[in-house]
Each structure stands twice: as structure tokens, then as C-alpha cells.
Amino acid sequence: MVALIDQLYNVTALRECSSLNVAAWIVFGLGISKMVFLTLNFSKMVLDLFVLPGPDFKKYGKGKGAYAVVTGASDGIGKEYAKQLAKRGFNLILISRTESKLVELKKEIETECKIDVKILAIDVSSDSKENYTLIREVASGLPVTVLINNVGKSHSIPVPFDQTEESELRDIITINNTATLMITQTLLPQLKASVKTLKCRGLILTMGSFGGLLPTPFLATYSGSKAFLQSWSNALAGELSSDSIDVELVLSYLVTSAMSKIRRSSALIPSPKAFVRSTLNSIGKRCGAQERFATSTPYWSHALYHFIIENTVGVYSKIANSINYSFHLSIRKRALKKAERQAKKQ
């Protein structure tokens, strides 16, 4: 009897040991698979950023008289999109709020590049039907194949959501979301027709932000507006793939601009010129956004930052949220102190 019990005990122990071995091998296999996956994705990111060539813009109508529409074109990133697309041979339709800046940019580009530049000064924060009628009219009859949705607005300084001015909240949603969607919808029939006429592809680039990638305390409205553009761009990319129109969301971290209030560029904070150059050279490549559809993080330092966050703590983690909270709270405190000093001087 004792021998039988010992035998049963040994069998049970053997089974438990075997189960533990199987579990250990499963965990080991999953770990190896994850490491291989990360290594492949990292290698692909490096290839996208530094090795693989940029796109041939002939596929978007370059050399066929095609037009590119750029919103928010009078300053910063939008201005650079206009200049660099002009150098690639595209005619332009430039849309922005300040007519004097558009007139100046039009003269500069037409002198340097010998292309046709049309301008339209409208305030998209008003969300009037007249705006979209004017856009339709200025683009009427022109072979539009590229749309750069660059216009955007953020908070003047980081601010708690319940202290956000209603006017600022409404402007952010109207400019970043409503206007972007309405401009795209207004021009989309023309893009589809131009693609067929010129026998090329179309392109819609929309400016996203790390503020949308990472939920950002003290920029809650802006953060939500940019996160919306991620889902919208992904959905639109699926819809338009059969129409030969490429749709991409472009993610950026800090860039020297009026919106960021950063004046000096560095290795980690590019100028608009450097950022747009990397963007146009990365169309069709994911760069730092390897796990995301129809999305690119094109500038090298932004791409590395994105890759690390996505593959460590995660963009929706409490750790990432806490770091973002502390960072933007610090910015808010400095901005309030600066405003206080300026008020005392007056």
C-alpha cells in the first residue's frame, strides 16, 4: 500500500514538474517572440528613417500640372510645406487667415519656383459655409492631387479643463476637427476626379501631435482633438484606398513654431524646414509609428521617442500620464509667473 502511494506521489510530482516545464517554455517562447518582434520593428524604423529612399512625387502628379492645397500656410510648418512642395514642382493653393502673409509668400514662391500659386484668406474658426464655398471656387477646375491639413490651434498655455475659456475650447475643436473634416470633404470629389484624369495617386496628409498620441493633462481639449484625427485618418485611409488616395496622419513632438513658443531648434527640436523635409521624405513609411496604420512619426528624434514609449510603458499608461502631468504643470507655472511679471511692468 505504501509503495502504491509513493508511486502515485511520484507520478503526480512528475506531472506537476512537466506542467511547470511547459509553462516555462511557453513564457520563454513568448519572450523570444516579443524580442524578435521589437528587433524587427526597430530595424524597420531605422531603415525608414535613414536608409530607404523617399517617395517619387511623380506618382502624385508631379510634372503634370497638379496642385497641392496647404491649410495654415502663412507661417511655420504650413509655410514650409508650401515651399518644399513648390520645389518639387507642384502648383499651390494656399489657405490661411492673414492675407498679407499669403501675398508675400505667393510672391516669394512664384519668383523662386516659376509655378502657379493661388491664395485664399479665410478664418476657419468661424466655421461658416461661405468658407467652404470659397475653397471650392478657388480650386474649381484645377487638378488637385495633394491636400495638407496643417491648420491647427492649441491652448495659449497649459490649463485645467474646467478653467478653459469657452471661446478657446470652441476654437480648438472647430479649427482642429470641424474645419479639417469640412475642407477635406469639400475637396475630396476634386481629388478623386483629378486622380483619374492625371492617372496618378492622391495624397491627404493631416498634422497630428504627440498631444493626441499621449493623453495630455492641462491640454485636455487639444489632446482630445488630435486623438480624434488619429481615428479619423485611419478610417479615411481604409475608405479611400480603392480610390488611389493615400491618407496619412503625421505625428510630431516639439517643433520651433508660434504654437509651441519655442524659438531655437536643436537635435531634438527641429525647425519647420527640417521637420517638413523629413515628412515629405517619409510618405508611405511608418518610421517611429511602426505599430500604427496610416500613421508616420517622421523626424528621427520624435520617432525614437515614440518607439520607446509605445514599447515600454505604453501611451495610455498611468506612468506616461503622470510624467505628462508634471511636465505641463511645470510649463503652466512658468507661464503664469511670466504673465505676472509682465503685468507688474505695465
Curated annotation (Swiss-Prot):
The chain crosses the membrane at residues 23-43. GO terms for biological process: fatty acid elongation. Keywords: Endoplasmic reticulum, Fatty acid biosynthesis, Fatty acid metabolism, Lipid biosynthesis, Lipid metabolism, Membrane, NADP, Oxidoreductase, Transmembrane, Transmembrane helix. Pfam families: adh_short. Its EC number is 1.1.1.330. It is found in: Endoplasmic reticulum membrane. Its main location: endoplasmic reticulum. NADP(+) binds at residues 69, 123, 150, 222, 226, 255, 257. Pathway: Lipid metabolism; fatty acid biosynthesis. It catalyses: a very-long-chain (3R)-3-hydroxyacyl-CoA + NADP(+) = a very-long-chain 3-oxoacyl-CoA + NADPH + H(+). GO terms for molecular function: ketoreductase activity; very-long-chain 3-oxoacyl-CoA reductase activity. It is a single-pass membrane protein. SUPFAM superfamilies: NAD(P)-binding Rossmann-fold domains. Gene3D superfamilies: NAD(P)-binding Rossmann-like Domain. The active site is at 222 (proton donor), 226 (lowers pka of active site tyr). One of its GO terms (cellular component) is endoplasmic reticulum membrane. It comes from the Eukaryota. Component of the microsomal membrane bound fatty acid elongation system, which produces the 26-carbon very long-chain fatty acids (VLCFA) from palmitate. Catalyzes the reduction of the 3-ketoacyl-CoA intermediate that is formed in each cycle of fatty acid elongation. VLCFAs serve as precursors for ceramide and sphingolipids. Belongs to the short-chain dehydrogenases/reductases (SDR) family. This is Very-long-chain 3-oxoacyl-CoA reductase. It comes from Kluyveromyces lactis (strain ATCC 8585 / CBS 2359 / DSM 70799 / NBRC 1267 / NRRL Y-1140 / WM37).
